[in-house]
Amino acid sequence: WRSIDDRYDGRKIIEEQKQRLVQADERRLEVLRNGLELGEIKVTAADMDDLAFSVAVRNITDGHAVPTGFDAERLMFLDVTVTNGDGAVIYRSGDRDPNGDLRDTHSAYVHAGELPLDEDLFNLQSKFLVRLLRGGEREQVLPINTSQGVLPFVRPEAFPTTIYGRPRGTRKHKQTIDPLGTRTAEYTVPSELLTGAGPYAIDVKLKAQMVPVNLILAIQDIGFDYGM
């Protein structure tokens, strides 16, 4: 970098890479728009008791579900905001905690009781369910069997998983939308939240994310590639 000519050449490379990043973002948006369709907001109730509305999310592809691939890691959710006539936010769903996680059962802030669970969350991310020691199941970020002893040990399956199509100790709770399928998200804003002057405005955004933050937290002790 001592040579000014080298710095100018380096700047040209950086500008070219920035343009390519913009093009990549445009292509990603194009892929999402070709795969999903967000319907119109339908208000089903608007009185002194509550404000209720719904919005349909449709998979407009005929080849595979949405999301596809590693659907237990990929988030596709609705970010919903309701504001009053003064512009104040009176209702949120699909917002993030300070870590960047949705307010679902894997949020550290929800676990600690610092934020309420987002009971209206619309999320197409499938979840792993693992079998517990004394029966029953629970959601887990990583479906890896763990030993109760002090030594790390992954117990191998006693039966071939190819026969059952999945490991017997874990399964996935499917949340994806089938090809050409539709799922409707429904929301209700209770009367105690309908504060301030009207009219009330509803804003709905469909967002996609490759991996949740809680997955990064679960694997960070192992380390990352490229020295990250």
Language-model segments: residues:
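Short, conserved sequence motifs used for protein processing/export or organelle targeting and
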Residues: 1-228
